[in-house]
Structure formats: C-alpha cells, structure tokens
Design a protein with these regions (language model features):
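Terminal leader/tail segments of proteins
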Residues: 1-104
Length: 104
C-alpha cells in the first residue's frame, strides 16, 4: 500500500513497487531505487521543484546523488564509496549503486 510522505513543502508519494522504492511527484516516478541501482526521471519537467524533490529524496534515503543546474543544463553529481562523478542528466538514467566489499 502506498504511503504519502512530505518531501519539501509538497506531498510526494513514497511506496514499494516491483522490488524498488519509488518517489512519485504528480504522475511521474522521479526516483526509483533498490540495492543495485537508482533511476532518475523528470518526466520532462526539468523544473526547480522537480530537482529539489529529487535531492530531498536522495538526502532522506542517503542515496548519494545531487541534481544541479549549470547554464541551463542539468547534471547529476554522484558520490559512492567516496568517489565522486558528474554526469549529464537524462530521463531514465541509471546510477549503479556500489557495494561494500566484505573481507573474510
């Protein structure tokens, strides 16, 4: 069953679907993630609000990404295992989540 949580000053639905945790704003699943990957999607709404909600989801679930805008273009800064990378934003982009290495 879906639960609606506040992300920022507006309600964003947070729920489980097909093995993913999903953050949905209006009709768009803006962030989907599981233990292996994070999928970002603006639904074509590259607005300050969408960007802010994505970043608040990242902060709330400690996903390690930050969406920013430079000269009108969106970028994603992704930090995993203390390694930072910057990517051009594309709807449906997938960030691979890094696994911790366990030594016996």
């Amino acid at each position: 069953m879906a639960r609606t949580d506040k992300v920022g000053t507006h309600k964003t639905a947070i729920y489980q679907s097909d093995g993913y945790t999903v953050a949905q704003s209006h009709d768009t699943q803006i962030v989907r993630f599981n233990t292996d990957e994070i999928i970002l999607n603006s639904g074509g709404w590259q607005t300050k609000t969408t960007k802010s909600r994505m970043n608040k989801v990242s902060d709330a679930f400690q996903l390690g990404f930050r969406v920013s805008q430079r000269q009108g273009e969106w970028f994603v800064d992704y930090f995993a295992n203390e390694i930072g990378d910057t990517y051009s934003f594309n709807d449906g982009m997938i960030l691979e989540r890094y696994k911790e290495v366990n030594y016996a």
